[in-house]
Amino acid sequence: MSINHPLSVLLVGAGGFLGTVARYLVALAFSPASPGFPFATFSVNIAGSFLIGFLSELAVSTTIVSPEARLFLVTGFCGGFTTFSSYMFEGATLARDGELFYFSLYLAGSIVGGFVALYTGIIAAKPWS
């Protein structure tokens, strides 16, 4: 199936819907417990980075993740689940509020943690590739 096939749009949209709902549920779960640090966004970005690495490696190296499943899971679900724009906004809010420790921890931790999670996902997929 080509990327401009109508089913491709539906797969990405359905995955994005589910990823967005999952992100919202994570935010609800974390909201009472994280008044100072944006743990929900941090968590979904780290988890999403792992998933993108894991699923992309399987899609490239095996037949376990089909091109259609990759559209649904990686482009759709993970695209809806991860939150770069929220990450930037929450980082700017921490800086504006003078929370320089949390600002630094959040931005650097998200980048380093995201990279480590992505690479870990790739390594975790290797037994199947």
Swiss-Prot record:
Activity regulation comment: Na(+) is not transported, but it plays an essential structural role and its presence is essential for fluoride channel function.
Superkingdom field: Bacteria
GO terms of molecular function: fluoride channel activity; metal ion binding
Segments forming a coiled coil: none
GO CC annotations on file: plasma membrane
Catalysed transformations (reactions): fluoride(in) = fluoride(out)
Keyword annotations from UniProtKB, A to Z: Cell inner membrane, Cell membrane, Ion channel, Ion transport, Membrane, Metal-binding, Sodium, Transmembrane, Transmembrane helix, Transport
Major subcellular location class: membrane
Biological process, per Gene Ontology: cellular detoxification of fluoride
Positions that bind Na(+): 79, 82
Disulfide cysteine pairs (residue numbers): none
Membrane topology designation: Multi-pass membrane protein
Compartments where located: Cell inner membrane
InterPro entries linked: FluC (IPR003691)
Membrane-traversing stretches: 10-30, 35-55, 71-91, 105-125
Stored NCBIfam families: crcB
UniProt record similarity statement: Belongs to the fluoride channel Fluc/FEX (TC 1.A.43) family.
Function: Fluoride-specific ion channel. Important for reducing fluoride concentration in the cell, thus reducing its toxicity.
Protein name: Fluoride-specific ion channel FluC
Native species: Chlorobium luteolum (strain DSM 273 / BCRC 81028 / 2530) (Pelodictyon luteolum)
